[in-house]
Amino acid sequence: MADPEKQGPAESRAEDEVMEGAQGGEDAATGDSATAPAAEEPQAPAENAPKPKNDFIESLPNPVKCRVLALKKLQKRCDKIEAKFDKEFQALEKKYNDIYKPLLAKIQELTGEMEGCAWTLEGEDDEDDEEEEDEEEEEEEAAAGATGGPDSAEK
């Protein structure tokens, strides 16, 4: 694929389109805004500074540049399709939500509020009493600790 003589006509046309976009075609206006200021600023030679994105792409061989730019175009197309899918999916959800509303209202009407139960579990009352006693003891300890009573010094 790297050799232009071995490429088919479709591949060479795609490369031509991509190269036109890279050289200021229709995609130049919609390109990354981050790369534009980097091209305008003068480059100071710094050994430890990372190369800007633009220099990295320029350092690649032409066939690789073409592939990168073609992949960028394809990704933009995928993003547009995905946005369209999301929009249609939301519309579909809204449509079926409207259909479900009457059914959900009937279910809510039938179930209504929880009705009281005449019976209780055997150990349920004992557990409630123990929990209340524990809470009261904790409150007393907290109150004694806050006032600095004799109980707080012992613990």
Swiss-Prot record:
Compositional bias segments (type: Basic and acidic residues): 1-16
Biased composition (Low complexity): 27-49
Name listed for the protein in its UniProt record: Nucleosome assembly protein 1-like 5
Native organism: Rattus norvegicus
Keywords attached to this entry: Coiled coil, Nucleus
Coiled-coil regions listed in the entry: 68-94
Localization annotation: Nucleus
Lineage, opening ranks: Eukaryota, Metazoa, Chordata, Craniata, Vertebrata
Cited InterPro entries: NAP-like_sf, NAP_family
